[in-house]
């Protein structure tokens, strides 16, 4: 199976790109969705997180208090490493299972941390959806309702844009309209079909 890693910073257009590929009949494995699934109520990772951090990470219904945990890990690199040590191996295993089950001509692995988590090791080619920091902040603040400061912290925690550009095999600049994004994706889709 030919696997294309798709990455980009917050607000870059990863979701728009992955949805376009899905409309072309290409299966998409989304690392963010997998990451949410592995910490659902009843999943072993959730129990490990509560043991490592304390019950404050749980809401009254037993689900993960994502916002509180996110704020905590952005303030504490040590806590972030603890969380990643618990979740990353479980996430990787689930991603591999989903990639292996794909039946489309190729499969897309969407991951905002494709390089940071070494998920690029699972791919044959890597596509960066790129946007300027100003565009990223504008899109993410409109979409998520987060403060500019919180979005800047997220951007700062991710691999620098220039490094992602160096590591990517293909780069799509998404500073404009969706029509322009889709035009660039059409050419890449044809290349990926002919891998």
Swiss-Prot record:
Molecular function GO terms recorded: ATP binding; dephospho-CoA kinase activity
Give UniProt keywords alphabetically. ATP-binding, Coenzyme A biosynthesis, Cytoplasm, Kinase, Nucleotide-binding, Transferase
Pathways per UniProt: Cofactor biosynthesis; coenzyme A biosynthesis; CoA from (R)-pantothenate: step 5/5
Task: Name all DPCK domain ranges.
Answer: 3-195
UniProt cross-references to CDD domains, sorted A to Z:
DPCK
Report the function annotation for this chain. Answer: Catalyzes the phosphorylation of the 3'-hydroxyl group of dephosphocoenzyme A to form coenzyme A.
Positions of disulphide bridges: none
According to its UniProt record, where is this protein mainly located?
cytoplasm
State the Gene Ontology BP annotations: coenzyme A biosynthetic process
InterPro entries referenced in this protein's UniProt entry, alphabetically: Depp_CoAkinase (IPR001977), P-loop_NTPase (IPR027417)
Q: Give the family per the record.
A: Belongs to the CoaE family.
Q: What is its EC number?
A: 2.7.1.24
* Annotated positions binding ATP: 11-16
| Gene Ontology cellular component annotations, sorted alphabetically | cytoplasm
Q: Does the keyword Kinase apply?
A: yes
- Name-wise, this protein is Dephospho-CoA kinase
């Amino acid at each position: 199976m030919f696997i294309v890693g798709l990455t980009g910073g917050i607000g870059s257009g990863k979701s728009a790109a992955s949805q376009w590929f899905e409309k072309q009949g290409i299966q998409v494995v989304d690392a963010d969705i997998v990451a949410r699934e592995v910490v659902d109520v009843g999943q072993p990772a959730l129990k490990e997180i509560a043991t490592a951090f304390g019950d404050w990470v749980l809401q009254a219904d037993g689900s993960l208090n994502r916002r509180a945990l996110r704020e905590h890990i952005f303030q504490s690199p040590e806590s972030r490493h603890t969380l990643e040590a618990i979740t990353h191996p479980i996430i990787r295993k689930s991603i591999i299972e989903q990639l292996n089950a794909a039946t489309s001509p190729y499969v897309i692995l969407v991951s905002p941390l494709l390089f940071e988590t070494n998920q690029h090791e699972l791919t044959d080619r890597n596509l960066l959806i790129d946007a300027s920091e100003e565009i990223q902040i504008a899109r993410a603040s409109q979409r998520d309702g987060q403060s500019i400061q919180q979005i800047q912290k997220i951007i700062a925690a991710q691999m620098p844009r220039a490094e992602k550009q160096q590591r990517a095999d293909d780069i799509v600049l998404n500073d404009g309209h969706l029509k322009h994004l889709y035009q660039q994706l059409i050419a890449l889709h044809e290349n990926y079909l002919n891998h």
